[in-house]
């Protein structure tokens, strides 16, 4: 996915510059870079991923003139467990929640929500599909996301944007608050 596609999916969620956000399951940073650009130089993005190689790649692609924006701090860690992060003005989990088993998803979403300030958004980017494969072992349709966020004690998500997925189907972004 290109940075501009990631920006198109999440831009409606970033309503003001600055703030402290986390990109959970950041990988090599496509959505981290998009978020950093949207937040601008007064923002901070904590990019959390369990793969040190992906985070090294992310470090190489941020903080340069070619990718201006928020300060990006990489953290090697598993977003499904406890995280040592400050209170967040927003959290993004893009193309990562579908790796968490259905039985663990509510607890993970509750844990992430506990890091958010009162009105802060949780932004989710996922594939709108039901077909399971090795890349999307636990698909989360918009309807499934609604059930998940309600189970986790959050509100009803609103779809922000959709676009064709690279290989098949659709990718969507959604925002949810308490």
Describe the predicted segments one by one:
Residues 80-91:
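A short acidic, Gly/Pro-enriched loop at the edge of an enzyme's catalytic core
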Residues 22, 28, 33-81:
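Class I SAM-dependent methyltransferase SAM/SAH-binding core
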Residues 130-144:
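Acceptor-substrate binding/catalytic loop of class I
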Residues 161-178:
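Core SAM-dependent methyltransferase catalytic element
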Residues 119-127:
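Conserved beta-strand signature within the Rossmann-like core of class I S-adenosyl-L-methionine
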Residues 106-118:
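A short glycine-rich, Lys/Arg-flanked "PGG" loop and its adjoining helix->strand segment in the class I
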Residues 1-19, 34:
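Conserved alpha-helix/loop element of class I SAM-dependent methyltransferases that forms part
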Residues 89-103:
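A short SAM/SAH-binding and catalytic strip from SAM-dependent methyltransferases
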